Amino acid sequence: MTDQTNKIYLSDVTLRDGMHAIRHQYSLDSAVAIARALDDAGVDSIEVAHGDGLSGSSFNYGFGAHTDLQWIEAVAGTVKRAQVATLLLPGIGTVHDLRAAYDAGARIVRIATHCTEADISKQHIAYARELGMDTVGFLMMSHMTSPDALAQQAKLMESYGAQCVYVVDSGGALGMRDVAARFDALKAVLDPATQTGMHAHHNLSLGVANSIVALEHGCDRIDASLTGMGAGAGNAPLEVFVAAVDRLGLHHGCDVKQLIDAAEDIVRPLQERPVRVDRETLALGYAGVYSSFLRHTEAAAAKYGLSAFDIMVELGRRRMVGGQEDMIVDVALDMLKAREAA
């Protein structure tokens, strides 16, 4: 486990992954209120962007209530201690977007790719380092490749300049042994100076447990969000994770009661669809489907009179990955044709 004398680095993602839960509709006032509460409670960083990262606001992913820069500027002007982070997916966001985010106040960037496509992150990681940003590699859908193969992708990101590399369980499909194996593999090949992080989703109710297992296997940074606000069944709930590690005697530097109050009083009332494990979100973890497919799949199921659970299982069977949201409708239409032909 991470040395108990070392503080766990807590990266909050309520204002980025949490965007998925409300279709990217945070008001600036809500963003400021959440950021202020997180800053007061003691988190290390607050990630801010459209749910699909810089420039994610689009027909394919959903249009945001505000621009990334408006959200980032609002949060950067609010926090006194926490650093502002953002997310960039090569192919959606560009280095020009990254520069604009930096100018707006972001000082940390997570460059996110599918777990087997680290090679497309080279330009963005290098540019982030030129800007002097804390530069993080973010390997999404980490359940879809082996621990050793994932470690080699992490090594690529490190070679480009990433100072930290994340195991990202985008589908909430990893078990505790899976997490342990991946961190052991990363630690075996990465330079000791390169940190590692865990981004969990709660689709199998393992978000907190997997994050603790990651710590036991050398993880340095943990992503979490208030009430678990995030795609699918959400992320590891920040207030729950901090309470759990507090009972384990680990140093986290946060005020547990303030986090609980922020979760219940500020964030939970914003949920238009409860962020929880239910039939549809469990299907994501069971089938290993990208968590942000949830709302898109539910919309397709309602439109075509199909089961969202069945669509998700088929998406998992076809091994769809982030960025293939347009295929959800294709899968639904294929299922509709098959039903009509039966």
Curated annotation (Swiss-Prot):
Q: Which UniProt keyword terms apply here? A: Aromatic hydrocarbons catabolism, Lyase, Manganese, Metal-binding
**Span of domain Pyruvate carboxyltransferase:** 8-260
Instruction: Select a single GO molecular function from the record's annotations and give it.
Output: manganese ion binding
Q: Which InterPro entries match?
A: 2-IPM_HCS-like, 4OH_2_O-val_aldolase, Aldolase_TIM, DmpG_comm, DRE_TIM_HOA, PYR_CT
Q: From its record, what is one biological process in GO terms?
A: L-leucine biosynthetic process
Query: Could you say which residues are annotated as the site Transition state stabilizer?
Result: 16
EC annotation?
Answer: 4.1.3.39
Q: Output the PROSITE patterns linked to this UniProt entry.
A: PYR_CT
In this chain, Mn(2+) is annotated as bound at 17, 199, 201
Q: Which family does it belong to?
A: Belongs to the 4-hydroxy-2-oxovalerate aldolase family.
Please give the name of this protein: 4-hydroxy-2-oxovalerate aldolase 4
Where are the active-site residues found?
A: 20
Superkingdom to which the source organism belongs: Bacteria
Q: Which reaction does it catalyse?
A: (S)-4-hydroxy-2-oxopentanoate = acetaldehyde + pyruvate
Q: Which residues bind substrate?
A: 16-17, 170, 199, 290
